[in-house]
Each structure stands twice: as C-alpha cells, then as structure tokens.
C-alpha cells in the first residue's frame, strides 16, 4: 500500500491535486476512476465531445487526451525516481500537448480505452513498488517530488479533471 506523502515530499502547487485523494486505499481509488470517466462521457455524441464549454477551454475529448498524457508523464517520472535515477526531468507545457495530440479527431470510445490502458500500466507500476522505492524522490520541473507523491498527483489530477468535466457537462 502506498501511504500519503508528507507535505515536504512535493511542491506546494501539487497540494490541490493530492488533497482530492481520499484517505484509504489509493490503488483501489485509482482503479475506479476510468469507469467514472466512462460513465460521464460515453454517451456523448461527437459534436458534444468536441465542443468546448467556452472559447479557449478544452473539449471533452481534449480533456481525456490531457488526462492520458499527464498520467504518462507523471508515471514516467515515478518510474525514473523509483529506479533511483537522479537525472533532473524537465517540465512540460500542457496546452502545447493538447494542441499536438489532436484528440478531437479521435473517437470518445478510443480515448476512454486509452485512459483505461494507461491507468492499467500506472497501476502495474505502483503495485510493484516497495516502500523504499515509493519513498525515493527526484527533481521534476525544478522541484523535488517523491514517487508516492507522484502517485497521489496522478490520482488527484484525474479527480480534478473529473470534477471539471462534471461541471462542464452539467452546463
């Protein structure tokens, strides 16, 4: 079981995401999230899924692609740091990734399947970690962060985006 990180294991800007993860079994919480996304967006038609709520905001499809990309990046960071790799990892510009991903050209079902697959890979990594590995840390985007904090960021980021999607779809 991966325990909740201490406040000194991550930069303050990650606190919002980590706070969205409830106490209890992190991995079980993470296992359920893809189904929550599916329940929210699976019945949308393509027009609904590509229409942003307001100009400059992301569409449902772009949000799904963003969740996948962010999870891959955070998972990669977790893998590197768990393996005691001390090489500093650069940050990424999420808006550039969203534009380059061209998620609006993909089907919603394809994006949901990708999310489930990415989450499965993340869970496999996290389930394999020893306590020592989960407590290791490294530098990403100029800030120190532990592997277990990254696990909580992954879950909390997905939860944050689920909440945004709920609001967006509620109108």
What are these regions (language model features)?
Residues 21-56:
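Short, contiguous, helix-prone interaction/anchoring segments in small proteins
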Residues 21-25, 107-112, 148-151:
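Active-site rim elements
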């Amino acid at each position: 079981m991966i325990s909740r990180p201490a406040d000194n294991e991550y930069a303050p800007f990650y606190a919002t995401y980590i706070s969205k993860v409830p106490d209890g079994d992190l991995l079980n919480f993470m296992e359920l999230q893809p189904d929550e996304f599916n329940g929210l967006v699976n019945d949308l038609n393509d027009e609904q899924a590509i229409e942003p709520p307001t100009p400059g905001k992301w569409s449902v499809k772009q949000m799904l692609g963003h969740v996948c990309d962010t999870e891959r990046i955070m998972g990669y960071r977790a893998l590197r740091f768990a393996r005691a790799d001390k090489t500093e990892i650069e940050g990424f510009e999420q808006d550039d990734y969203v534009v380059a991903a061209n998620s609006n050209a993909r089907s919603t079902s394809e994006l949901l399947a990708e999310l489930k697959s990415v989450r499965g890979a993340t869970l496999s990594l996290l389930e394999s970690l020893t306590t020592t590995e989960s407590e290791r840390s490294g530098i990403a985007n100029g800030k120190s962060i532990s592997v277990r904090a990254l696990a909580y960021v992954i879950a909390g980021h997905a939860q944050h985006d689920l909440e945004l999607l709920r609001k967006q779809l509620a109108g």
